[in-house]
Amino acid sequence: MSYLLPPVIYLESKDFTSSGNLKHFKDRTCVVMIQANYCGHCTTAKPFFQKFAENNKSVVCLTIQGDGDDPDVKKMVNLITKIKPSFQGFPDYLLYKNGKLVEKEINGRTEEALVEFIN
């Protein structure tokens, strides 16, 4: 699986405030998968994230594409390191509740790990 499909939404830099919070979905729980197409671990994790998105409609599932030639991708990579200074590589995950970043690390890349991550 190289591309995630709806209901997963691809984010752009314009979807974030200057402080790194989400502009939209302020009343929702959101999980953001930070991924890259060249990343083997991402390729393994994407089907779990896709299934999580399909099975958990109350959660907004978003993704940040961390590779490619689009100028916005470069902005997104810079934004990732601002939002999550501990970012070390792909894949990684962010949790937002009511539009605000929740400082929390995920323990794994499975659908079960994602369920635990949001609770």
Predicted regions and their residues:
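The canonical Cys-X-X-Cys-His
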Residues: 39-42, 93
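Short glycine/proline-enriched coil/turn segments at helix->beta-strand junctions
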Residues: 27-28, 56-58
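Typically the conserved alpha-helix immediately C-terminal to a functionally engaged Cys/Sec
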Residues: 41-57
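A short glycine-leucine-enriched loop at secondary-structure breakpoints
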Residues: 79-88
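Short pre-active-site segment immediately N-terminal to redox-active cysteine/selenocysteine motifs
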Residues: 35-38, 89
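Thiol-based oxidoreductase modules, predominantly thioredoxin-like and allied folds used
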Residues: 34, 57-77
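N-terminal leader/targeting and pre-domain segments
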Residues: 1-30, 64, 86, 92, ...
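Eukaryotic short linear interaction motifs
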Residues: 40-41, 69-73, 102-103, 112-113
